[in-house]
Amino acid sequence: MLSPKRTKFRKYHRGRLTGKIYLIDKVVFGNYALQSLEPGWITSRQIEAARRVITRYAKRGGKLWIRIFPDKPVTFRAAETRMGSRKGNVEYWVAIVKPGKILYEVLGISESIAKYSLKIAGYKMPIKTRVIVKI
């Protein structure tokens, strides 16, 4: 699973999911991309599951770019613990995604396979997504 090697602080506040991408996020590396349509947290496991789907359909031919990285730790306190007494342990890492963010890009595979694999990868995400084509 993806996680940062080191961070400035071990634990962070949860924060709020407000706003959108102000600079329009474009397809930079590949020809086809998966774009988010709503805000959310995407865990490192979900990123890995979608990566596996895309690489399985691309076989040996294509190249894949993952444009998000899980750099926010999510903590949980143990069950039946009293209030107070510090923050819980880091359980997993998430990437903060806003509407319009490019999640994955592919290059070097046919249009039908690229669109289909990105569509299936979108089903692995906890947010609505769409497949876009580089103009």
Swiss-Prot record:
Single GO cellular component term: chloroplast
Domain of life: Eukaryota
CDD domains hit by this protein: Ribosomal_L16_L10e
Main location, first listed in the record: plastid
Spans through the membrane: none
Subcellular localization(s) per the UniProt record: Plastid, Chloroplast
Gene3D superfamilies reported for this sequence: Ribosomal protein L10e/L16
Pfam families: Ribosomal_L16 (PF00252)
GO molecular function: rRNA binding; structural constituent of ribosome
Protein keywords: Chloroplast, Plastid, Ribonucleoprotein, Ribosomal protein
GO biological process: mitochondrial translation
Similarity comment: Belongs to the universal ribosomal protein uL16 family.
PANTHER family associated with the record: 50S/60S RIBOSOMAL PROTEIN L16, LARGE RIBOSOMAL SUBUNIT PROTEIN UL16M
Subunit details: Part of the 50S ribosomal subunit.
Protein name: Large ribosomal subunit protein uL16c
Organism, scientific name: Euglena gracilis
